[in-house]
A protein has these predicted regions:
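C-terminal ends and interior cores of transmembrane alpha-helices
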Residues: 96-109, 295-309
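Helix-loop junctions at membrane interfaces in 12-TM secondary transporters
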Residues: 106-118, 306-317
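Juxtamembrane intracellular "pre-TM" segments in multi-pass secondary transporters
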Residues: 2-20, 199-231
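Helix-to-loop junctions at the C-terminal end of transmembrane segments
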Residues: 73-85, 171, 273-286, 371-372
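Helix-loop boundary and gating motifs at the non-cytosolic
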Residues: 13-68, 224-262
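Cytoplasmic helix-loop-helix junction between adjacent transmembrane helices
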Residues: 117-158
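Cytoplasmic membrane-interface "Motif A"-like loop-to-helix N-cap segments
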Residues: 83-95, 283-294
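C-terminal membrane-cytosol helix-exit motif in multi-pass small-molecule transporters
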Residues: 184-205, 393-398
Length: 407
């Protein structure tokens, strides 16, 4: 097995100052993309259920399937970016596909149409995500990677705040389909920023080998990475999508026209915790922060059933769920580079996202089914039990594995 130092080596072309400028530029790309995406997602669950007539189980299947498609493409694009030594071409392609897809929600006449559009959007996300994360990790030293992902996530989430607020404002003058069409504008700006301001970081090309050769090279003898993927997969088997939080908010009495503001509350909380969680991860350990993220999710699961009778509770639930998303999404990405050499990071991020995608698909379908058939309490009980298992496993990982990689 490679030594810890070998697995965390950096491309010689990156520097902290220039690298953080690249991270900031990528953050701006994500800002405008999330502006576009969250305009759509703030109203999409109700469009699918109320306008198109889907059930909660179908909503879970749509979201889970779309994410599965996305995560599968991340494996392919991540591996290809390692083989070619190029990240940016995949990032540009992915953002362009997503931007072009979302306006077609306006033409959806059934939940099948909505699923196809959602899948197209997620294909774009799948193409770009692993190479983009590898580009972020390649841009800075390993000691600053938590800050880099925290900064990127925070700028990203500022767009996720603006998007639902913009959707709320637009709903005062146009219908939901008009919101879908308007999402094209910020998405196009994102692609332009990416093309003109994000720089490629030169990395060592991986020697030519069959497609799955990268996976073999990545995982051979790398027990820590395999264990980390297993633990993350277990947690993802219990995690549920934000869409269920919005449906629960409606049950708590939030009017449909106000739901985008509940979604904005998720994203405000998500944004506020991004940079602090990245800095804390660099200081106390990324694996410890991951446990904290899992614990916050467990708390949000309990809040799904412990609050009722007051619409204001929905905003508290949204805020706690946003904290979980901010910590988890920042730290789960930041922990990978410690165990992987730079020329295999695209593959590593792709494999990570594939594991998460498959497990998240199962979780969302099962959560929606349990809620429809047995009630919300059964669905939350399932999520909570799985979360406790993942937390326990991560604590063992911290005690047994992390000390071998401590710097």
């Amino acid at each position: 097995m490679d030594s810890p130092d070998d697995r965390s080596n950096k491309p010689k072309s990156s520097s902290n100052t220039g690298g953080m400028r690249n991270v900031t530029a990528l953050g701006l790309v994500s800002f405008f993309t999330d502006f576009s995406t969250e305009m759509v997602l703030g109203v999409l669950p109700f469009f699918i259920i109320t306008t198109l007539g889907a059930t909660r189980a179908l909503l879970g299947a749509i979201e889970g399937s779309a994410e599965l498609v996305s995560h599968a493409f991340r494996m392919v694009s991540g591996s290809l970016s390692d083989k070619t030594g190029k990240r940016k071409v995949f990032v540009v392609t992915g953002y362009a596909v997503s931007t072009a897809s979302k306006p077609f929600f306006a033409a959806s006449a059934s939940w099948v149409d909505a699923f196809l559009v959602r899948a197209g959007d997620r294909v774009g996300k799948g193409i770009r995500t692993a190479p983009r994360d590898a580009l972020i990790a390649d841009s800075v030293s390993e000691s600053r990677v938590g800050r880099a992902f925290g900064l990127h996530r925070t700028i990203d989430q500022l767009g996720a705040i603006v998007g639902p607020v913009a959707a709320f404002a637009l709903l005062q003058i146009v219908d939901i389909r008009g919101v879908f069409l308007a999402s094209l504008i910020p998405g196009a700006i994102a692609v332009l920023v990416l093309v003109f301001f994000v720089k490629e970081i030169v990395v060592k090309k991986k020697e030519r080998m069959p497609f799955f050769g990268n996976i073999v090279a990545l995982t051979r003898g790398n027990r820590p990475l395999l264990l980390l993927l297993i633990i993350t997969g277990i947690f993802s088997l219990g995690a549920f999508n934000f869409s269920f939080v919005l449906i629960r908010a409606s049950e708590l009495g939030v009017q449909e026209s106000m739901i985008p503001l509940v979604y904005a509350a998720i994203n405000i909380s998500h944004t506020a915790i991004g940079i602090p969680s990245g800095i804390a991860a660099d200081r106390i350990g990324k694996e410890k922060m991951l446990v904290i993220g899992f614990g916050i999710f467990l708390a949000s699961s309990v809040l799904m059933i412990s609050m009722s009778g007051n619409a204001l509770y929905a905003y508290l639930l949204a805020a706690v769920f946003g904290l979980y998303a901010g910590v988890s999404e920042t730290v789960q990405r930041a922990v990978i580079p410690r165990y992987v050499a730079s020329e295999l990071r695209g593959t590593a991020f792709g494999l990570y996202y594939l594991v998460v995608g498959v497990c998240f698909f199962v979780s969302n379908v099962l959560f929606g089914f349990l809620w429809d058939v047995y009630g919300l309490s059964a669905a939350v009980t399932y999520s909570s039990i799985v979360s406790v298992i993942a937390i326990s496993a991560m604590l063992v990982f911290i005690r047994k594995i992390v000390p071998q990689y401590a710097k």
